[in-house]
Amino acid sequence: VKKRAAFGNPKTARSYASSVYGDCLDIITIQTMPKGRKTVITTVDHKRPDVYQKLLEQVKLGHQAYIVCPFIEDSESERFKDVLSVKTVVDEVQQFLHDNAPMYKADSISGDMKQKDVLAVIDQFARNEIQILVSTTIVEVGVNVPNATAIAVMNADRFGLAALHQLRGRVGRKGDQGSCCLVSDTSNEKLAAMTMFPSGFKIAEVDLQLRGPGDILGSEQTGDSKVVDMILRYPKLAAAIRNYFQTKE
């Protein structure tokens, strides 16, 4: 009998494999951090100038930093008047550096830029020609700059837990202590969970509790489900049902 081992990180890939192979698939979970990696210290902050100062302190130590914003440009809608954009924040940071540390540079990338221009800025950041990179969530995956040790997420309450956890995974990737500032005018269970739990598994559990699983067969991605609720509340019952059908085969 041939045996195969597949390694994957994204939850979608694991879910797909479970759907295709069902009980024929053994899932082994690695719950330890990569060798040399430290838990990213996560805090909630309310004042942007204080956050910029914290990032500058990391830059002065020879490291680099990210700032992530929800919007590319400021919205004209009254509803989103307090939501920060890449264009606003990069202007603020550049002025902050000009006033406090003109030898350092900040720049930005966003989804409305041409791919070659985005890659050019990322390449400069990777070479430490840019010390602070302001962006949308396009840095969430696929960007690996080991020298980056700090990240600030503006209007963090507007992001999902999965996105926040992925974003803080951008820093501290070569063993240096990483830090993540969640900048928000409000405090809620979601942000509290980020400060309390470094584990993606625990973050996923909290996310499930806060949002609900939604439809198993359907399009709703949030809301209560009696079936999933029963499985979560009574794991021994779920295991007994699974064993029953396995023995019948």
Predicted feature locations:
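Conserved H-loop
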Residues: G8-K11, P70, T137, G142
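Structural beta-sheet core signal
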Residues: R4-A6, I67, C180-L182
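Conserved beta-strand scaffold positions in the cores of enzyme catalytic domains, especially
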Residues: R4, L25-T29, A106-S108
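C-terminal helicase module of SF1/SF2 nucleic-acid helicases/translocases
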Residues: R48-H63, S85-E249
